[in-house]
Amino acid sequence: MQEMSGLDLIDLLGERHFGLRRIAEELWNERGDVAISNSEWFVMTRIGSGEPTIAEVSRQVDITRQATHKLIRKMLEKGLVAVSDDERNRKVKRVRLTELGYKCYENNEELKAELEARIAEAIGTDKVAALKAILAMDWGLKNRET
């Protein structure tokens, strides 16, 4: 891993996030039957067990509606999501995880728990708990956070 001692907070967080996502994606692709990109995982996490509109997903992942539609089309082809008309407004499309999508989502949650356990083994459970608490705090940046 690249030398990180000279990095500021923003870059440290970014490097760790990128590294963990890469490891998680590699582990999933070694174990899973369906190749799923980080972008697809990000969308699947936003969908979860709900049925948001495609516009809501687009706002949550902070990408254009066009890019969201393209990503969801790829996920449809893989059988990870299903799209349906909203009951009240047929112009509005809702997206949900399919049985396969939800199974992948659940298996990925287990994989992330394994990674967290490995991190705790390396740095200690107390430090992992402290890190999670710090990351969950209100950092006073509400005007830019989502």
Show which residues each predicted segment covers.
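C-terminal regulatory/oligomerization modules of transcriptional regulators
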Residues: 1-4, 125-146
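N-terminal leader segment of winged-helix/HTH proteins
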Residues: 1-34
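N-terminal positioning helix adjacent to the helix-turn-helix/winged-helix DNA-binding module
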Residues: 5, 39-40, 100
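Amphipathic, non-transmembrane alpha-helical scaffold segments
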Residues: 10-17, 61, 109, 120
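Alpha-helical structural segments
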Residues: 19, 48-49, 114, 118
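N-terminal helix-turn-helix DNA-binding core of bacterial DNA-binding proteins
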Residues: 22-66
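Charged, amphipathic alpha-helical coiled-coil/dimerization segments
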Residues: 26, 73-130, 136
